[in-house]
Amino acid sequence: GGIGLSFSMLTEKMGAAQVIGIDPVEARREKALEIGATNTIDPSKDDMYEALEDLTGGEGIDIVVDATGDPEGFGQSLKIVKRWGTFVSFSLTGSTGKISEFPHQEFMFKAATIIPTQVAATSQPTKDIREMIALKERGWADPGLLKSHNVGFEDVQTAYDMYANHEDGVIKVVMELNGGGKS
């Protein structure tokens, strides 16, 4: 989704030689390739582990970012991270907050650095917005590239339904409070 795409955009700018986007939604895989990913994998059709083995020569991934919101994402990330790699957990896992598995042997063998994050939480939103604007002005990241739809505020439920059901290639929706508009 939008968080994973943002990481794809930024890591490519930071010089990552290979950026792999994993997403079951075709529109998001296409967007990932447009904004910096070198490869994408559809985990609903492809064996993700086999595809990653081929793409990395069996070495695993240096930096894995889990932004799936899926309880299985944590365990999968530990399985695909390179030995002594880094795993950034940027994912909430539903109302229980529990992960489905913790592959302890992978954890011990990989000796990966695990970095937890605070998802969508900030005490200074205007500061964060200014930083994002500065990144855009320097050509580092353009959050506008993630916008897939504009809707007027009166269509908030339609926008939410599109987002919740992954309809119409939705990635990020901009709500316009002044009766804006349809695209």
Feature-to-residue mapping (PLM):
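N-terminal Rossmann-like NAD(P) cofactor-binding module of classical short-chain dehydrogenase/reductase
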Residues: 62-65
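C-terminal hydrophobic helical "lid"/dimerization subdomain
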Residues: 75-78, 127-183
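Helix-to-beta-strand junctions that scaffold the AdoMet/dcAdoMet cofactor pocket
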Residues: 81-83
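Glycine-centered, small-residue-biased loops immediately flanking beta-strands
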Residues: 85-86, 112
